[in-house]
From Swiss-Prot:
Keywords in alphabetical order: ATP synthesis, Cell membrane, CF(0), Hydrogen ion transport, Ion transport, Membrane, Transmembrane, Transmembrane helix, Transport
Ion transport among keywords: yes
Organism: Bacillus sp. (strain PS3)
Full protein name: ATP synthase subunit b
GO CC annotation, single: proton-transporting ATP synthase complex
Domain of life: Bacteria
CDD domains, alphabetized: ATP-synt_Fo_b
Lineage: Bacteria, Bacillati, Bacillota, Bacilli, Bacillales
Transmembrane segments: 16-36
Amino acid sequence: MLWKANVWVLGEAAHGISGGTIIYQLLMFIILLALLRKFAWQPLMNIMKQREEHIATKSTRRKNDRQEAEKLLEEQRELMKQSRQEAQALIENAASLAEEQKEQIVASARAEAERVKEAAKKEIEREKEQAMAALREQVASLSVLIASKVIEKELTEQDQAAS
């Protein structure tokens, strides 16, 4: 019964299996394989090869892009490092210039204070000399006045004694 079912499935239920049909079917299968190879398999393999090349190209490009990005990142880091160093140098330079200016301003202020002090001393000395001269003049005037009074008194006493 199994044999009959298998034969019926193959389409040969009423007849026996013919050798010519098998050869014809085998020949058609080989032709089908050849046609599939030429028109389907080869183009499919070409597409697969192109896809593989495309993926390899993308992978290579991605790898190159990654390397370039890493290189640019390293360059940026180096530039940032240089910028920080330059900024630090500018800050240090500005600090030293500020210190120099501070010292110059302090020195200038000290010199100005010394000049003002010397001018004040000279002014005090001049006023002292003027006061001394005025005092001498006043003492001389008073001395003359006192002397004239004393002389006048002596003269009047002598005049009185003589009279």
